[in-house]
Structures are given as structure tokens and as C-alpha cells.
């Protein structure tokens, strides 16, 4: 065989190998913070519109068994990406969990302290001596403690209600719950005929923060930086698409999540739309301000340098 012929054979083999490997999508498992709802709509829209596929990503979306599962599973590398909360990641970082925050889904607080109207609750001080539920252990109970300190609530009983927000309130098991979103559980309660009130945390002393964020384990990030950068690009693109085409985006969501309650999710989407992240890059200064607040009010017991957990690369 001549040298020229050998060269041509090698070229053909190289092209064949390149073609067979280049089309393989990177498979990622994403765990939600909660059951699927319109907070997560841009992710489902991205999948429906083929935005992930265009970046050669294949996303498997799963729901947590318990409200505190997502962060731990991502930090340990058992899933690739988790949706978490800014306060939760700062608390976890102070406790030594290794993770990287690399994107945002909801850029301002949605969390409230929710209660039924007609219970004599007008100001936070009226919660003195009450039974207050919380949704996410290790997060909402800690935020509740800070809220109580800020608003001079000296005595209350904290009760873990997990996912059972509506049932706990309507059955009288608790007088209020820390953790419901002003864009979602308020809608659910209204549709079930209950009038509710709520305290927005940022209006009662808690600093502004990113409600829903994307995190991954430190080892996962070290291995898949380009993949995570691609994921961020997709989320940015999906949110822009949702803002420009809200009605079609909602239709895409219902096709992806056919079991969703259409009435509730439609009304909740209208309230949620303004809160989707305007960009993926995280504000280190804003994050540090919250971390400093967390140390001052006992959410954490040692200082966290947020630059050590935030991925600020623009890609």
C-alpha cells in the first residue's frame, strides 16, 4: 500500500470517529427544589424548544423526595445539577459542604410567612406564642429564627410541615408557615376558597437575595465546566424566549408537564414572570451582603467568603 493510500485511509477513519462521537449529547440529571411548577417553566420550555439539544445537552428532570434533598445530592455528586436557594447554599457552605453556584432562575425573594386571614395577625409581633410551620429543614426554620429576632418575636413553636403547606394551615395544625411563595401558594389557597395574608421577608428585615439558583458539586464543576457554561446559555435563552412569548411558553410547559393544574399554574405564571432572572452572572457583592447578614443574625456560625462558592465566569 502506498503512503498516499495509507494517508487517505487514516483520514477516512478519523472522519468516521469524529462523526460518530460528535453527535453524542451530554446527559445531565437536574433535581428540582420542589414538585414541578411554573417556577421551573424556563427549563421545560428549553427542553421543548430544543435549546438543550442545540447545545448537545440531554436533561433528565427529577423531583426531590424531601424538601432538603436537592442541595445535598448535588454537593455529593449524586446528581449533576440542583435547584436550590441562596440562603440554603450559604448555610451549607458554612457547614463545610462543597458546591458551586453557577446560575440563577428566580432573582428576588418569593418566600413569605403565610397565614390565614381572620386569625388576628396584622404584624409580625402578632405571631408571638403561635405555632409556625416551616417547609425546608435547615433553611426555613433558620430564616424563621432570623425573622423572629428582627421583629421581636420571642416565643413561638416551630413545626416542620414539609410539602404540606395548605393542609397544615387549613387543618389548624399551625397558625402560619415560613416558606410559601407569594406567587404560588397564595394562588392555591385562593382557588380553594381561603383568604390569606403574608409577610414578605425583604420588607421585614431580610436582605434581597436570589430565590432559586443552580448549583453543582465542586468535583462535577471541575470536570464539566464547558457543559455548565452551555447550560447557563440555554437558561438565558429560554428566559428571554419566555418573556417574548409568554402564552406559547405556557403551552410548551403544559405539554412537558401534562399533570399540572392548568388554572393554578396559569395564574401563578402571571405572578412569577417578572421574577425570572435577567442574567445568569451572579452578583458577588450582593451575595456577600446576605452572607454577612446571615452571620450577624445567627443563620451561620462562621463567615462565608461567597467568592469561594460562586462561579463568575462569563461564557
Residue map of PLM features:
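Bacterial N-terminal signal peptides that target proteins for export
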Residues: 1-8
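Bacterial N-terminal signal peptides
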Residues: 8-18
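Sec/Tat signal peptide C-region and signal peptidase I cleavage site
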Residues: 18-25
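Short, glycine-/small- and polar/acidic-enriched structural segments
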Residues: 27-162, 166-171, 175-183, 198, ...
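A bilobed periplasmic-binding-protein/Venus flytrap-type ligand-binding module shared by bacterial periplasmic
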Residues: 45, 111-121, 210-227, 275
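Pocket-lining segment of extracytoplasmic ligand-binding domains
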Residues: 87, 163-256
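Secondary-structure end/capping motifs
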Residues: 222-299
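Conserved C-terminal helix/tail region of periplasmic/extracytoplasmic solute-binding proteins
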Residues: 292-315
